Design a protein with these regions (language model features):
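N-terminal secretory/targeting leader peptides
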Residues: 2-19, 24-122, 130-363
Length: 363
């Protein structure tokens, strides 16, 4: 029987030993699903995660369960992935849930709230702090549920044609930004634009937008933003550890054999780890290339960050006052963040800062 590469990982081997047995694999039905992504095929990080996920599922079932992946626009536009799953036009989608905060604001926390947790703490909250249950409660009206399948790590703050020296420079700025960060910046005069990944560069090139945030150096380099915007800001305070999910139609999910459900969940975990590790391997080199090509790195000024932080708290509190689900999700997230940061500030931050002091001059 074909060797299943994703089963070699310790995190998934135990949960999938049973379904890997030849007799069981032979007894499983042949099933074909379609997966639509919100991202272009050119992004071998994010879209590559969808392909890796589908590959793992196929390998673990001896190709009995095949998931065909489609990039944004091939079946449905990138921003309509949740709708496609909800109506069962496709069985599943790869999409960041903060794309749909217009439908349910609490979904912001599923990807990551502004000034929220880093990637590891965010995923810990998902598994152990109630994040998954709260998200799936939010998705229930859409007849779907979420499987965690990736994280970008802390993102960059975006590409700007002009420098951001003060809060006044934000006023009137047409900024492509997804999720709750755009709502926060609107309070400071920004005109947020939500545009799917494959459509961003033309909008920036034509001047339809003045600035864009997407992910980080590697993906941003691939999409060519450095060709039309000189200043590259950090940090992406609206995405401290952005989670990515597979959204599955509940009826289609319930029709799967239990063994296939186990494989899908574990393939999501394995592909998600692959995604974060991929970013760690490719972002440093991409950032060096961008700098060599004339990109100017800029940190957001402290007064700008303070204004954004205060506007974030005001906005999140306003939403919590209007929605019980948002309030419960916010309280769960904030309590978990406070708890994990208690330890992080003692051990990890001290270690990381010391190590940076020893290596910074060598990079």
């Amino acid at each position: 029987m074909k060797r299943r590469t994703f089963l070699q990982g310790g995190a998934v081997a135990g949960a999938t030993t049973l379904v890997a047995a030849p007799a069981i694999a032979q007894s499983m039905p042949e099933i074909k699903w379609r997966l639509t992504s919100s991202f272009p095929r050119s992004l071998d990080t994010i879209y590559g995660t969808a392909q890796t996920f589908a590959k793992y599922v196929a390998e673990a079932t001896d190709n009995k369960f095949q998931i065909q992946t489609f990039s944004a626009g091939e079946l449905v536009p990138g921003l309509q992935a949740l709708d496609a799953v909800s109506t069962a036009s496709v069985e599943m989608a790869q999409t960041p849930l903060y794309f749909y905060i217009g439908k349910e604001p609490a979904l912001a926390y599923a990807t990551g709230a502004p000034f929220g947790m880093n990637h590891r703490h965010q995923e810990s909250w998902w598994h152990f702090g109630g994040g998954a249950d709260l998200t799936n409660e939010a998705l229930k009206p859409f007849k779907a549920h979420a499987i965690l399948c990736g994280n970008s790590g802390t993102q960059m703050g975006g590409w700007f044609r002009k420098e951001i020296k003060s809060v006044d420079d934000l006023k009137g700025l047409k900024f492509r930004i997804a999720g709750m960060g755009g709502h926060v910046l609107a309070k400071l005069g920004v005109v947020p634009q939500q545009i799917a990944g494959g459509d961003i560069y033309p909008a920036l090139e034509k001047g339809t937008i003045d600035a864009v945030e997407f992910v980080g150096p590697y993906d941003d380099e691939k999409l060519g933003f450095y060709k039309v915007a000189k200043y590259y800001y950090f940090p992406g305070w609206w995405e401290g550890g952005a989670m990515l999910h597979m959204i599955v139609n509940d009826e289609k999910w319930n029709s799967l054999p239990k063994q296939y459900q186990v494989i899908v969940n574990q393939a999501g975990a394995a592909a998600g780890a692959w995604m974060l590790e991929k970013y760690d391997s490719v972002n440093p080199g991409a950032l060096k290339r961008l700098i060599a090509n004339g990109t100017e790195l800029k940190a957001f000024p402290q007064p700008v960050l303070e204004a954004c932080y205060n506007a974030t708290q005001d906005h999140l509190n306003e939403l919590a006052a209007k929605s019980d689900l948002f309030k419960r999700t916010k309280e769960s997230h904030d309590a978990y963040m406070k708890e994990v940061l208690f330890y992080t500030q003692i051990a990890e931050n001290f270690y990381d800062n010391y190590l940076l002091s020893k290596t910074r001059s060598k990079t």
